[in-house]
Amino acid sequence: MKTILSNQTVDIPENVDITLKGRTVIVKGPRGTLRRDFNHINVELSLLGKKKKRLRVDKWWGNRKELATVRTICSHVQNMIKGVTLGFRYKMRSVYAHFPINVVIQENGSLVEIRNFLGEKYIRRVRMRPGVACSVSQAQKDELILEGNDIELVSNSAALIQQATTVKNKDIRKFLDGIYVSEKGTVQQADE
């Protein structure tokens, strides 16, 4: 069954500016600019009101799968707005039973070097995604902090670090060593 029209709106905060170029959304905020291309999805994007402070996503004559993209696009735009206002921060903790994992940050936080993982001599190097900065926490031992505006790049960088410390040819229920995401949040606290 096809639904005639499905639409949803996203409210845009005062300090955020959104521009549309076709189906490309550009979000400008206090922390920077993010752009995302939705050309592969057949929907209508429009800005509403005199001050253009609402973004509407329309889908005409869609089946169930196509209608789901409406909410997905709204969620992506909300994540972009949150990114340029508050920023995203992931915290990761080193876990080890015997050999202490030594993490060194190189190239102004864009390269992570992992040494002494399970006592190995091999140095694991993980490059951060563009726009993601990594630092070692001063308050907490064995903690990494990843910060950026794009939630997908920050979470992907965290995944690359976690996957770099996978234990091969051992029972992973016993060998729990690695670097894991311990906390997900924002750089600045939202005023609620």
Curated annotation (Swiss-Prot):
Gene3D superfamilies linked to this entry: Ribosomal protein L6, alpha-beta domain (3.90.930.12)
Record PTM N6-acetyllysine, positions in chain: 121
Q: Which residues form a coiled coil?
A: none
Fetch the InterPro entries from UniProt: Ribosomal_uL6-like, Ribosomal_uL6-like_a/b-dom_sf, Ribosomal_uL6_a/b-dom, Ribosomal_uL6_CS2
Q: Chief location of this protein?
A: cytoplasm
Any one GO MF term held by the record is: rRNA binding
Query: Subcellular localization, per the record?
Result: Cytoplasm
Highest taxon of source: Eukaryota
Biological process GO terms, please? Answer: cytoplasmic translation; translation
- A cellular component term, taken from the record's GO annotations: membrane
What keywords appear on the UniProt entry?
Acetylation, Cytoplasm, Ribonucleoprotein, Ribosomal protein
Q: Which family does it belong to?
A: Belongs to the universal ribosomal protein uL6 family.
Q: What does this protein do?
A: Component of the large ribosomal subunit. The ribosome is a large ribonucleoprotein complex responsible for the synthesis of proteins in the cell.
Query: Assembly and interactions?
Result: Component of the large ribosomal subunit.
Name the chain's protein: Large ribosomal subunit protein uL6
* Source organism (scientific name): Homo sapiens
* Phylogenetic classification of the source organism: Eukaryota, Metazoa, Chordata, Craniata, Vertebrata
